[in-house]
């Protein structure tokens, strides 16, 4: 990125922002509570084996299902070379392997945001030499970026259990450029019930939890255009695309 300071809000002085391992830390303790805090801790410890689990255990259990899912989700966005992209809840950056053919990641000004420092560190280790990547630790409910900054904003995995889903949606829209297309995706209630509540690694984190897709859809402001909800991977995942009004 040519000038990293340009992506941040005008009241944020880049030289004053704390960094850890080259990752900008913009955490507001107000949002590090409840489910946000619980799942931040979960992903911090899962970060050590997350990619291994998806590559090998996921492959054994689901075949190429996860690969097809990520490819389909990424195809719903309007990718071009030399654009600016915000990936909210970037995790280890797994979706970056599934961009449409012809897209050169090194031409893209890519910003990844996540509440989990563990996942961000894994992401940096895997992608810093392959991309033009800036990583920021922050809650989705308070993105530290300037209004109308990114050509693409997308989120895959997490919003089901954000503390304030509507605020996170509002923030993603705020930082997207007018006319740009956004994607929000996460697991359906069926997948949470049959996978996360059964897995020895995650069941304690999802006890008593459920997913209300209708409620999540209602968190998207009425001002958006071209809103569309799709189900993927045999109804295990949903994806909602919409366009920010000009």
Q: What are these language model-derived features?
A:
Residues 151-164:
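A short SAM/SAH-binding and catalytic strip from SAM-dependent methyltransferases
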Residues 166-178:
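A short glycine-rich, Lys/Arg-flanked "PGG" loop and its adjoining helix->strand segment in the class I
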């Amino acid at each position: 990125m040519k000038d990293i300071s340009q992506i941040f809000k005008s009241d944020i002085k880049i030289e004053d922002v704390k960094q850890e391992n080259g990752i900008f830390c913009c955490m507001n303790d107000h949002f590090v509570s409840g489910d946000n805090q619980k799942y931040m801790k979960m992903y911090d410890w899962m970060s050590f084996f997350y990619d291994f689990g998806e590559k090998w255990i996921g492959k054994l259990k689901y075949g190429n299902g996860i690969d097809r899912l990520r490819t389909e989700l990424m195809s719903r966005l309007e990718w071009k070379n030399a654009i600016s992209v915000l990936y909210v809840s970037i995790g280890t950056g797994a979706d970056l392997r599934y961009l449409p053919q012809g897209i050169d990641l090194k031409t893209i000004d890519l910003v990844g945001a996540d509440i989990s420092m563990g996942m961000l560190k894994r992401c940096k280790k895997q992608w810093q030499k392959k991309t033009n990547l800036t990583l920021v630790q922050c809650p989705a409910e308070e993105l530290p970026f300037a209004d109308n900054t990114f050509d693409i904003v997308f989120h895959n995995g997490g919003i089901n259990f954000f503390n304030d889903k509507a605020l996170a949606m509002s923030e993603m829209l705020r930082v997207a450029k007018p006319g740009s297309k956004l994607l929000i995706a996460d697991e359906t209630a069926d997948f949470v019930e049959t996978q996360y509540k059964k897995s020895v690694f995650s069941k304690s984190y999802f006890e008593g939890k459920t997913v209300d897709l209708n409620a999540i859809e209602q968190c998207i402001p009425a001002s958006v255009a071209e809103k569309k909800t799709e189900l993927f991977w045999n109804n295990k995942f949903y994806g909602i695309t919409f366009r920010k009004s000009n």
